[in-house]
């Protein structure tokens, strides 16, 4: 009986230390629709008026804003890391940028015909979320990370907006599509357009063509690329790492055993959140 009582007390204690995830939305004039997002709020968020650093956590192609909560179990990971002191208290924002029917639903973080998502993200989404959920709201307290399409989106966002983010953690990142890595056909549906947008916003070509001033700005961001050794996008992370080294832009590259799946990304998140935390000012 004493053991059962002790376990119950422990369960109550852990529950009282947990953060929570809520679903919210932003009405976008740029996209002409309501954009849903999930946001993780750390324990005690409602009991104080402090300002928090923020992480934008991006999903992959064919997923949506629920993926990191439901498949990645990010609340468990965040609660554990914050409680242990491995990560600081932070808010984590998971915006919607797609859906499972990739041929008929817009997916992607870049501007493309009919879907100016990058404009929405920086002009509408970030200001609205950070105002409502009292984020610190500066480069030193803002990070972006994501998997696959979201890993590529995170990388390119930091390349194109280095004044906005302190760090980028890209998991199994879709960084380029010169070789049609996602197997898109010639039919010009919505999957075709996201494929073309990734090609046009190649993170590899961006570094290859960067001038000295651009490289200087890229050095103000902390970079981490994490990809499985059997991932079909493996070569892209390795290639970008080499380009960064050639340009004297410091980055971290981790190649671990794994493929393009949630088992890999769940473990990656355990490294990504402390990485972001260490690089907040």
What are the residue ranges of the model-derived segments?
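Sec-dependent signal peptide recognition
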Residues: 1-9
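Absolute protein N-terminus
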Residues: 1, 18-19
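Non-catalytic cap/lid and distal C-terminal segments of serine-dependent acyl enzymes
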Residues: 19-281
């Amino acid at each position: 009986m004493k053991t059962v009582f002790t376990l119950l007390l422990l369960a109550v204690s852990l529950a009282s230390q947990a953060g929570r995830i809520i679903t919210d939305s932003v009405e976008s004039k740029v996209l002409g629709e309501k954009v849903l997002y999930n946001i993780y709020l750390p324990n005690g968020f409602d009991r104080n008026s402090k300002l928090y650093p923020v992480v934008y956590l991006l999903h992959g192609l064919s997923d949506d804003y629920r993926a990191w909560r439901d498949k990645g179990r990010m609340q468990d990971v965040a609660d554990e890391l914050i409680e242990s002191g491995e990560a600081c208290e932070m808010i984590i924002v998971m915006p919607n940028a797609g859906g499972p029917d990739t041929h008929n639903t817009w997916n992607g973080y870049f501007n493309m015909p009919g879907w100016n998502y990058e404009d929405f993200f920086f002009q509408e989404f970030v200001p609205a979320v950070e105002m409502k959920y009292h984020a610190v709201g500066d480069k030193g307290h803002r990070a972006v990370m994501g998997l696959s399409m979201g890993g590529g989106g995170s990388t390119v966002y930091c390349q194109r907006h280095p004044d906005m983010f302190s760090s980028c953690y890209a998991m199994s990142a879709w960084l380029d599509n010169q070789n049609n890595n996602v197997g898109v056909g010639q039919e010009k549906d919505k999957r075709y357009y996201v494929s073309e947008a990734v090609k046009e916003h190649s993170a590899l070509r961006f570094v290859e063509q960067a001038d000295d001033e651009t490289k200087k700005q890229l050095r103000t961001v902390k970079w981490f690329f994490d990809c499985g050794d059997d991932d079909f996008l493996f070569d892209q992370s390795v290639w970008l790492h080499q380009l960064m080294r050639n340009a004297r832009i410091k980055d971290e590259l981790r190649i671990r055993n794994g493929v393009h799946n949630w088992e890999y990304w769940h473990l990656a998140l355990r490294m990504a959140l402390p990485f972001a935390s260490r690089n907040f000012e």
